[in-house]
């Protein structure tokens, strides 16, 4: 069955025909159709509903009288949430609007959240929080002078976050504090993207092309040429704006899907354009073992990378086949050991909880296998259902009920002396869970902290790149973005426009000649 999110203008006659018989809320977990109405009901109410129905689809058609639905309304004279099941109204809450628009928005979303908890029987681990950066809220509240008790109350009472999730967010904020305190107003990082892969994973919605396809393979060489030119222009833009580059990150896609000569060209450009000894960190996503051999690992090491990622996602051959990977778990083990042999001493490994065909026991096995390899970082993602991914189309009715138990397996990481150092959430993530980076002491990925907490500018190069310009000296102050063309062919064909847009970096920083502290905005993280 599909979960449908309906939008339309609401009138009093619609409420009248929904019925008014009230019975206790059902915990049957019925798949609801949702109607939202009113400016204050819009964005936050939609995403509150998506906590429970992440794969909801949009429509403008009101269901008939027999359909199950949720109605959330924000009018100048009424805030109302109503549930109808089996043709009968089973839950209704209403109240007059009070306070400013944000207070009314929170009141409506709280009623909607409480009702959906009752209808579905679900207690989301992050409560009604809709923001993707919970840790940032702690940093902001501390900056506002809030006490630790007030911050805890904000999470547990205002958001209805579970104590376990709050404790994790707080421990991450504590670990990040010294990193953020030493960040300077004119610091920045540079990201270079390689939007090519050996094959397409079923969960991926990224605009990446497979190098096995002849037409895609023909794009790789001109793409790498353009990327190297853009990196030179990026360095020039950083110099013109008086920015200090602290970290480099080459991601994808799969950067090692290019051949060894092209990888050497890219790495050589990075070494030529950027002062590598002055960097805090230089990460390259080696990614998949089916395109990462010893020669490429040596090139990455030779040109100064200080951190790499080798991303198994799972150590189950069956699950690897399910997601479209063309390698085995043994290939991952061999690649990791080769990386160690050539001298890589800071390695991250990614795992994903909730992949099709995986089990709690299978995920624990994958996690323990990664721990036994002893990498410096292990990042645990929760599967996110994205509409552009094959997984949504092919596995729409799959049962992902075990994913929460998989995520709880991260206790194994704590026992192995790993600690969480960064966290973010995504819309559409199964069970409203999170993605967490774990590290050994002293091996935090600084780029991940900087980009998640938005403490400094990220200059992006490559197709689909999004440069994020952050006002100096102001956490979460003014942010502007410069977008690159999304598709590889467009990026290559319109490359002159890409270069011209680099002028926007200096223009942004010309607004801040003194780079002084500016006022902090009010902290928020959803409602």
Predicted regions and their residues:
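Local cysteine-cluster metal-coordination motifs and their immediate loop/turn environment
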Residues: 193-208
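Short beta-strand motif preference
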Residues: 80-81, 192, 308-310
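N-terminal [4Fe-4S]-dependent radical SAM core
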Residues: 119-123, 143-190, 241
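Short, conserved phosphate-binding/catalytic loop or strand-edge motifs used
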Residues: 131-136, 172-173, 207
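Conserved non-cysteine loop/helix-boundary elements of the Radical SAM core domain that shape
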Residues: 208-409
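Flexible glycine/acidic-rich beta-alpha junction loops that bind and position SAM and/or redox cofactors
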Residues: 318, 322-323, 353-360, 375-399, ...
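TRNA-binding/sensing appendages of the translation machinery
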Residues: 403-428
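Radical SAM enzyme core and accessory elements
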Residues: 2-144, 148, 227, 441-527
């Amino acid at each position: 069955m599909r979960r449908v999110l309906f939008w339309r203008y609401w009138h009093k006659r619609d409420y009248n025909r929904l019925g008014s018989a009230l019975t206790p809320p059902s915990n049957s977990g019925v798949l609801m159709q949702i109607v939202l109405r009113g400016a204050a009901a819009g964005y936050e109410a939609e995403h509150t509903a998506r906590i429970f129905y992440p794969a909801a689809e949009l429509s403008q058609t009101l269901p008939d009288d027999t359909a199950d639905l949720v109605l959330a309304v924000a009018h100048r004279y009424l805030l109302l949430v109503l549930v109808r099941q089996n043709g009968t109204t089973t839950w209704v809450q209403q109240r007059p609007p009070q306070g400013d628009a944000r207070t009314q928005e929170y009141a409506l979303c709280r009623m909607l959240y409480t009702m959906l908890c009752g209808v579905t029987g679900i207690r989301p681990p992050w409560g009604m929080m809709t923001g993707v950066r919970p840790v940032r809220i702690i940093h902001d509240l501390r900056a506002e002078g809030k006490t630790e008790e007030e911050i805890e109350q904000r999470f547990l009472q205002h958001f209805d976050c579970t104590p376990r999730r709050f404790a994790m967010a707080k421990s991450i904020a504590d670990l990040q504090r010294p990193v953020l305190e030493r960040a300077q107003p004119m610091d920045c990082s540079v990201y270079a993207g390689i939007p090519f892969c050996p094959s397409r994973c079923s969960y991926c919605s990224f605009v990446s092309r497979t190098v096995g396809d002849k037409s895609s393979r023909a794009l790789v060489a001109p793409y790498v040429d353009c990327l190297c030119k853009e990196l030179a222009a990026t360095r020039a833009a950083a110099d013109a704006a008086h920015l200090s580059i602290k970290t480099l990150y080459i991601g994808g896609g799969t950067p090692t899907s290019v051949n060894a000569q092209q990888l050497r060209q890219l790495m050589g450009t990075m070494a030529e354009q950027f002062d590598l000894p002055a960097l805090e960190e230089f990460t390259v996503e080696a990614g998949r073992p089916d395109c990462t051999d010893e020669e490429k690992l040596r090139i990455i090491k030779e040109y100064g990378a200080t951190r790499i990622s080798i991303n198994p996602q799972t150590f189950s051959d069956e699950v690897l086949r399910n997601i479209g990977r063309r390698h085995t778990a043994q290939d991952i083990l061999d690649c990791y050991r080769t990386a160690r042999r050539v001298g890589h001493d800071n390695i991250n490994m990614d795992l994903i909880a909730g992949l099709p065909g995986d089990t709690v026991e299978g995920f624990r096995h994958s996690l323990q296998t990664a721990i036994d390899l002893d990498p410096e970082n292990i990042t645990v993602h929760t599967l996110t259902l994205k509409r552009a991914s094959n997984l949504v189309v092919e596995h729409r009715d799959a049962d992902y009920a075990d994913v929460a138990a998989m995520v709880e397996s991260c206790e194994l990481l704590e026992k192995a002396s790993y600690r969480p150092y960064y966290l973010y959430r995504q819309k559409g993530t199964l069970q409203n869970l999170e993605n967490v980076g774990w590290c050994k002491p002293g091996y935090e990925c600084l780029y991940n902290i900087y980009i998640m907490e938005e403490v400094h500018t990220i200059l992006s190069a490559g197709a689909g790149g999004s440069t994020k310009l952050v006002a100096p000296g102001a956490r979460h102050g003014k942010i502007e973005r410069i977008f690159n063309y999304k598709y590889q062919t467009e990026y290559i064909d319109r490359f002159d426009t890409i270069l011209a847009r680099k002028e926007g970096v200096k223009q942004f920083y010309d607004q801040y000649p003194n780079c002084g502290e500016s006022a902090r905005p009010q902290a928020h993280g959803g409602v």
